[in-house]
Amino acid sequence: MHDSDTDLIYSQAHNQVKNFTFDAQVVEVFPDMISRSVPGYKTIIDTIGRLSERFTQDDSNIYDLGCSLGAATLAMRKGITANNCKIIGVDNSIDMVKRCKMHVDAFKGDTPVTIIEGNIQDIDIENASMVVLNFTLQFIEKSQRQALLSKIAQGLKPGGLLVLSEKISSDDNVIDDVLINLHHNFKRDNGYSELEVAQKRSALEKVMLTDSLDVHKERLTQAGFQHVSLWFQCFNFTSLIAIK
C-alpha cells in the first residue's frame, strides 16, 4: 500500500494527458514529487536559508514568488538575523496557498509571514532586501519574463538579492540531450516508471518553457542587477544569484 503523499499521478495511462497544473491532486504529493524530480532541491532550499542570513536587511520585505508549500519561505525565516523584516509568499494556486499557510503556521519563527493567493506579475515589490523565484519563472510567458525581473530589480534595495532557480535548456542540442537523459535517469532511479516520465513530460511541455543559461543571465543584467552568477547546477537544473 502506498502512502497518501506518494506521487502516483502519472502512474496509470491517461487517454489524454492534460497540461500540468498545481491543483489539489498535485498539492497532496508535491513534496514527494519535488524530491524525486528535481535534483539538488534540498541543497537549493538550504542555501536560500543561508543566503537570507547574509542578504536580508533590517526593516525590509522578503518575497517568495511562487512559494508553493513554503519551503523557501521557512528556510528564510529560519535564517534571517535582520530585525523588523516581513516575508511575503505569493502563489496563484489556491490549493497551494491553503496548504502553505498550514505549513508555515506549524513552525514558530520571529519573522512574520503573509501568504497571498495572487499572480506574481500583479504584486508590487517594495522595500525588498531578498526575492526568491524558485522554479517559478519557467511557468511565466516568455514575453513577460523581462518585465517581471525588471520590476523585482526596481523593488530591491541596493545590495538586495534575487535567487533565480530554473530548469534550463541548452542551445547545443547534443548537450541538451545528454542533460535531459541524465535527468530522466535520475527520475527512474527515484522510482518513476517510463510511463510516468513520458506522461509528466507531455503534461509540462506546453506550460513549462525553458530558457538557456545565457538568456537568463542577459535578462538579469538588463533588469539592472550588477552581479550575476550561477551558483548551482545539476543536469539541467540550475540556480543563480543576482545582486543589485
UniProtKB/Swiss-Prot annotation:
Pfam family, any one: Methyltransf_25
S-adenosyl-L-methionine among keywords: yes
EC number(s) reported in the record: 2.1.3.-
Complexes and interactors: Homodimer.
NCBIfam families on file: carboxy-S-adenosyl-L-methionine synthase CmoA, PRK15451.1
Function: Catalyzes the conversion of S-adenosyl-L-methionine (SAM) to carboxy-S-adenosyl-L-methionine (Cx-SAM).
HAMAP family documented for this protein: Cx_SAM_synthase
Name the record gives this protein: Carboxy-S-adenosyl-L-methionine synthase
Organism: Colwellia psychrerythraea (strain 34H / ATCC BAA-681)
Lineage: Bacteria, Pseudomonadati, Pseudomonadota, Gammaproteobacteria, Alteromonadales
